[in-house]
Amino acid sequence: MIRLTEVAKEYPRSGVALSHVSFQVRKGEFVFLTGPSGSGKTTILKLLYMDDRPTKGEVWINGVSSNTASGRDITLLRRRIGIVFQDFRLLEDRSAEANVRFALEVTGAPKANIRPKVARVLTQVGLASKALNFPRELSGGEQQRVAIARALVNDPFVLIADEPTGNLDERATRSVFQLLRDINAAGTAVIMATHDLDLVRRSNYRTIELNHGRIVFDSAESPASARPFDEPFDVEITPTSRETL
């Protein structure tokens, strides 16, 4: 379903972001991307939803190649990919329901299908009773649930999550992570970048660790005892406050 082959990414100012990165993600798999800030996690995620293209190598996702994809190919591909960010990226002047509905409207979804789809995903994330609330009326955990609902409404085959619990307290983190686990159990692949090593250690999901743009560990190929991340990573805290669920 997803394959990276000898992928490298270089930027004119910052230099090498990725080097010789190769791995595959199977249908329905849950994969953690870990590593210190600047190790290449977010760069990989951007390549997966083709916000950027590799300098060398190739990214294959759902039959689309980064080397040959047209703009239309990428547009259609993104409709099948759910993306969740650390800072939620909600429209502040729209309700939870309207934020989710917008993701369908921009794809030209039939109007008759929009309301039931939105209701379904808001129920799935546990926010049916707060559909008309605006982001400012929701906690951080609830805002992230709205963002997840928005990512799910187009029935993606993979959910890409970039530090989805990074701005949440422990209680909200557990709740959001359990939601991601439930989504994965229902058949959607999840690729999650995180600094939260406690979360990783408590899970049995595949873990790929990056450092200086290279893969230094992949639990699919190495025993768990070989994991190199014994010490906490340096974490960048964004200005968004940590809120409870």
Please report, for each region that a protein language model flagged, where it lies by residue.
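Short coil-to-helix segment of the ABC ATPase nucleotide-binding domain corresponding to the Q-loop/switch region
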Residues: 94-102
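Helix-to-loop junction immediately C-terminal to a conserved catalytic motif
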Residues: 49
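Conserved ABC ATPase signature
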Residues: 134-138, 142-144
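Conserved ABC transporter NBD signature motif
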Residues: 57-66
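Catalytic Walker B motif of ABC-type/P-loop ATPase nucleotide-binding domains
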Residues: 159-162
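A short, proline-enriched helix->beta-strand linker immediately N-terminal to the Walker B motif
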Residues: 153-157
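ABC ATPase NBD coupling module
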Residues: 66-82, 185, 227-228
